């Protein structure tokens, strides 16, 4: 679907500042209950991947808990971004920083729940041959006991892949991302803590 708006409309959008729905290649704003991302389409990395085509293909798919594009946005017939479901909650990076600062506790069970929640979503995405490409704490939002995927600029549909191939690629991306999270945020200070985290990692890679 397509949404045509004016530059005046963009100038009057309210920025999202709660730590969620932020990306490296654009800014996100509130838009009638959804989020709208205005992409810097002139950046070289954006030009190279034909992001408009990617987002158009992804907009045909709906997955619960994944902020896939709803409509592509144009100003004066020029592609500038897309709308997506808005989740009003902090991202995982904010949560992990609070953990590291000692402001909240996170157990191995919490870690496993996060992994399982994301795994369930990439399983459905894999059915539609969507490769996630960009999983990191900035792009994961925790809301109502569930972990949501946002900022899907670099997702791509690859119809040449089977479901199994898509799932394999997505699990590799997910496992790599979560291993980085463990290494960065969980500096285990005791043998007991280290054993808990290593047990979590073993559980993840058995999937």
Regions found by a protein language model. Give the residues of each.
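Catalytic phosphate/metal-binding cores of nucleic-acid and nucleotide-processing enzymes, i.e., regions
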Residues: 24, 39, 120, 137-140, ...
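C-lobe/activation-segment region of protein kinase-like
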Residues: 144-207
């Amino acid at each position: 679907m397509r949404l045509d708006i004016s530059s005046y409309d963009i100038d009057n959008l309210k920025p999202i500042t709660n730590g969620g729905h932020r990306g490296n290649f654009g800014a996100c704003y509130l838009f009638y209950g959804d989020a709208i991302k205005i992409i810097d389409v002139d950046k070289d990395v954006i030009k190279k991947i034909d992001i408009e085509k990617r987002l158009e293909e992804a907009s045909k798919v709906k997955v619960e808990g994944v902020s896939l594009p709803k409509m592509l946005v144009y100003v004066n017939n020029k592609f500038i971004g897309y709308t997506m479901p808005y989740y009003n909650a902090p991202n995982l990076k904010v949560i992990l920083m609070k953990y590291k600062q000692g402001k909240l506790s996170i157990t191995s069970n919490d870690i496993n729940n996060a992994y399982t929640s994301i795994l369930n979503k990439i399983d459905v995405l894999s059915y539609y041959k969507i490769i996630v490409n960009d999983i990191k704490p900035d792009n994961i939002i925790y809301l109502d006991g569930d972990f949501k995927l946002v900022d899907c600029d670099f997702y791509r549909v690859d119809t040449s892949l089977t479901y199994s191939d898509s799932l394999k690629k997505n699990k590799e991306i997910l496992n790599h991302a979560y291993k980085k999270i463990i290494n960065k945020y969980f500096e285990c200070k005791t043998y007991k803590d280290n054993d808990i985290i290593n047990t979590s990692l073993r559980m993840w890679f058995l999937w």
